Amino acid sequence: DNGRRCGYISVLLFFNQMGLTTQVPMQYEIVSNKATNEYRETSLAKSRIIIRKPKVPVTEKNYMALQFLDMLKDVDVYSEMSGTDLQKRLYQYMRDAGLEISDLESYFSYYPDKLYKNLIETRVIYNGILA
């Protein structure tokens, strides 16, 4: 979009890139400002692509926070890591991405209650406080 960020990869591909799963997705999910519907499926080459509308407009400033929260919402479903190993991986990602809990808080209300449960169980909510 004229050199501006308008989306990000989501779900299994992002979990795989973070090293949280060894699964290689057969389909790719993209969250994009360009999505015209809440959910659309298409194909590119031999890959199935799912395009979703973002919860809020995606920008260069917020895409990492939104991508991280999307992942965290489903971390209990897709992650092959748990406990301290998972916590360390999530904390490391937050450090590398320059994310603080304060960067994420304004987006919490756009996510289901399950996010709050995962924030506590992974201890991400305590990053920088008790870590």
Residue ranges and their predicted role:
Residues 52-131:
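Hydrophobic alpha-helical interaction segments
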Residues 5-63, 89, 95-107:
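Exposed, interaction-prone assembly regions rather than primary DNA-binding/catalytic cores
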